[in-house]
């Protein structure tokens, strides 16, 4: 298989049980910091932290001069690197540019507050995040369900991927639905290619997940960094998947299912102007169609073309634009109503069966006739 996606990182985060606090380094010099919120700029003995939203406030206590004794100097050196004690993380949310913030429960009883991840010891973040990402990378529906409370379902890893992208790539439509119901962004793009959950499901050949995402409202027109939609990506992979290799047969079948689901969504709301050409037979028949919105002609599988349009093409009927109805009569069979139609692209008017004439034009014609007709 040609690698279109980057392999998902399944490495768990390491927890250092010896660390459980936010560390503030002592100042390296007496010069003022360029940031008013930089803890490194504060000559502290003990700091009480209180982050509220994006605001970091620090209360400084007076710094006492050390004595000449070695014991007191060591004590001051130790206290100059004090900590704001963390009890645990109780919530998370995404910040700008893929950064994370965590709701901290403090050991000193201070009100919980939001703190940027960069200010929190790695072991504290790891203890909170590891179960979540382990569950996501295993598509563990039960574990994800238990961990959802007070957590941002759109939390991102180092590659900007959410849990939804992982479970989509792993093929768990149950996990996809669980996360979607929890409010997951169905169209989130990662930072390693601009891939969405739909791209992941298409690229890893998960037709059931593709169908679920489409049903849930995922935008099939979202493009990755190469400008490819999930449908275009699936087509690209199918082209590079060997036809004669028995080992790839199942993969090709899966890709065709993915493409069929996505094509069905693309053409569901597209209106065909006319069929230009036909190729293939039976279930493999395709039509080259011209769209009413003026888009380029495209080859479309027969199942996605309205039956009446396909039948008209097969019967040799052509489409033209009617300008108005200028006459009415009963057909040769004595029953069928026919209308004399004036065309925009033809000089001669023609008699057409009622079924072939726009009902709006028929109504306008009838309104123009005397009441006794």
Curated annotation (Swiss-Prot):
Q: Where are the ANK repeats?
A: 136-158, 159-188, 193-222, 242-269
Q: What is the lineage of its organism?
A: Eukaryota, Viridiplantae, Streptophyta, Embryophyta, Tracheophyta
> Where does the record place the Chromo domain?
84-135, 270-320, 321-373
CDD domains the UniProt entry points to: CD2_cpSRP43_like, CD3_cpSRP43_like
Q: What Pfam families is this protein classified in?
A: Ank_2 (PF12796), Chromo (PF00385)
Q: What else is known?
A: Unlike eukaryotic or prokaryotic signal recognition particle (SRP), the chloroplast SRP from higher plants lacks an SRP-RNA component. It targets both chloroplast-encoded and nucleus-encoded substrates to the thylakoid membrane, post-translationally for the nucleus-encoded proteins and co-translationally for the chloroplast-encoded proteins.
Oxidoreductase keyword on record: no
User: Mutating residue 293 to A: what's the consequence?
Assistant: Decreased interaction with ALB3
Q: Where is this region: Disordered?
A: 65-85
Q: Which is an annotated GO molecular function term of this record?
A: protein domain specific binding
Quoted from the entry, the domain comment is: The binding to LHCP occurs through the first ankyrin repeat and the L18 domain of LHCP. Homodimerization occurs through both the third and the fourth ankyrin repeats.
Query: What tissue expression does the UniProt record report for this protein?
Result: Expressed in leaves. Detected in roots.
The Gene Ontology biological process annotation of the record reads: protein heterotrimerization; protein import into chloroplast thylakoid membrane; response to high light intensity
GO CC annotation terms, alphabetical: chloroplast; chloroplast envelope; chloroplast stroma; chloroplast thylakoid membrane; cytosol; protein-containing complex; signal recognition particle, endoplasmic reticulum targeting
* Superkingdom of origin organism: Eukaryota
Q: How does it assemble?
A: Homodimer. Component of the cpSRP complex, composed of a FFC/cpSRP54 monomer and a CAO/cpSRP43 dimer. Interacts (via chromo domains 2 and 3) with ALB3 (via C-terminus), but not with ALB3L1/ALB4. Can interact simultaneously with ALB3 and FFC/cpSRP54. Interacts with LHCP and LTD.
Keyword hit for Coiled coil:
yes
Q: Where is the transit peptide?
A: 1-56
Protein name per its UniProtKB record: Signal recognition particle 43 kDa protein, chloroplastic
């Amino acid at each position: 298989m040609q690698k279109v996606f980057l392999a998902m990182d399944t490495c768990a985060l390491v927890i250092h049980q010896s660390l459980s606090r936010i560390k503030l380094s002592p100042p390296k010099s007496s010069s003022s910091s360029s940031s008013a919120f930089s803890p490194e700029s504060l000559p502290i003995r003990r700091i009480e932290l209180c982050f509220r939203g994006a605001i970091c406030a620090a209360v400084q206590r007076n710094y006492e001069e050390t004595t000449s004794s070695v014991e007191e100097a060591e004590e001051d050196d130790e206290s100059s690197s004090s900590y704001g004690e963390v009890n645990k993380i109780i919530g998370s949310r995404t910040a700008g540019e893929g950064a994370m913030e965590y709701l901290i429960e403090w050991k000193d009883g201070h009100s919980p507050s939001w703190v940027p991840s960069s200010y929190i010891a790695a072991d504290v973040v790891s203890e909170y995040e590891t179960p979540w990402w382990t569950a996501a990378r295993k598509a563990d529906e039960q574990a994800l369900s238990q961990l959802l409370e007070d957590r941002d379902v759109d939390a991102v890893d180092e590659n900007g991927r959410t849990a939804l992208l992982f479970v989509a790539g792993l093929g768990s439509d149950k996990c996809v639905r669980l996360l979607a119901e929890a409010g997951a962004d169905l169209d989130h793009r990662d930072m390693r290619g601009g891939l969405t959950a739909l791209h992941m499901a298409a690229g890893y050949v998960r037709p059931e997940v593709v169908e679920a995402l489409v049903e849930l409202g995922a935008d099939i027109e979202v493009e990755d960094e190469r400008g490819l939609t999930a449908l275009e990506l699936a087509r690209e992979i199918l082209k590079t998947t060997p036809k004669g290799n028995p080992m790839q047969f199942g993969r090709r079948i899966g890709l065709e299912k993915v493409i069929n689901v996505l094509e069905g969504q693309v053409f569901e709301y597209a209106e065909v102007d006319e069929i230009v050409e036909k190729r293939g037979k039976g279930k493999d028949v395709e039509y080259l169609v011209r769209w009413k919105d003026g888009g380029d002609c495209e080859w479309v599988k027969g199942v996605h073309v309205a039956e009446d349009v396909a039948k008209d093409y097969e019967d040799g009927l052509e489409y033209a634009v009617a300008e108005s109805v200028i006459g009415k009569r009963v057909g040769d069979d004595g029953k069928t109503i026919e209308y004399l139609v004036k065309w925009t692209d033809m000089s001669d008017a023609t008699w057409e069966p009622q079924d072939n004439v726009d009902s709006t034009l028929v109504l306008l014609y009838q309104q123009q006739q005397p009441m006794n007709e």
